[in-house]
């Protein structure tokens, strides 16, 4: 299982999108009985609505000096999950309300989502936040929110006994082993 975690660690996953489908394709290679299912964006499921599909190709914050303080390609936790696209330059003061950190865990990068409220943001360690200088910042989020689907999978593995054991997990939280 550690080998699986290492293979899947860097895949950019959310509750929808290509990273989730890539993860399930990898798991299907390990367990061929795995069967995918999908539900279209906008579908009402009990008290919940399946959100739009979200895919990202790039996201970063870069100070005018060239120093990057968040880079989705290095750690996809840096981007608030479901961030809307943006490509602009802004001041430190305008950027700060869009940054999230955990002062009580100064070396950790938080995991933040925004499935239903259109917004953008970045997550960084509190130590990095405190090192950010005043000045201008290039802010890029190359993402797309579109009609798509929520994809999941299930498998029935027949064992030696008649009892059933259910294993359930999520794969939507990227780069975390203990969430």
Place the predicted regions along the sequence by residue.
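N-terminal hydrophobic/helix-forming segments and targeting peptides
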Residues: 1-179
